Amino acid sequence: MAPVGSYESLMAAIQGGADSIYFGIEGLNMRSRSSNNFTTDDLRKIVAICREHGIKSYLTVNTVIYGEDLPLMREIIDAAKEAEVSAIIAADVAAMNYANSIGQEVHLSTQLNISNAEALKFYARFADVVVLARELNLKQVHEIYQQIVDQQITGPKGELIRIEMFAHGALCMAVSGKCYLSLHEMNASANRGACMQI
């Protein structure tokens, strides 16, 4: 899986052998400041390119969602469903609930900071795929996996929850989804995709 923020990076990911890509549109994603973003008008073309090359497309809607963001969030998720993206990647219960209500598949973002099997059991009602907290070590990931198997923790499709994790990324002293330093120092919220990496 590779992040993309432009058609050039999309083609580079495909040529590099990615089996899936993730991207954001319209600002409600954690990559809103770190890359160019597509618009809802790009969705169909991105999905078509991905299908043509046999790869999956995941749309990130993984920021904190405030009340004033709800209309835009619904518009983005509606557009994702219409364009037939493989799934959205969400971190806010509002996005999870809305996507589930319209039949759009959801994967859970690392921004939720799921770091144990009890938290995973709670969120399993929303998604079949969970991206675990970046702060976990391999032993902790294995323990969560073992509990999924032992306790038969399933998602909406009735299948065992699949877990994913980041192998690299922004190295930060803060816990994912819980940082306020960038907002305090630079008036740019890391929890809204605008981390200044200070």
Identify what each model region corresponds to:
Residues 130-131:
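Acidic, glycine-enriched active-site microenvironments
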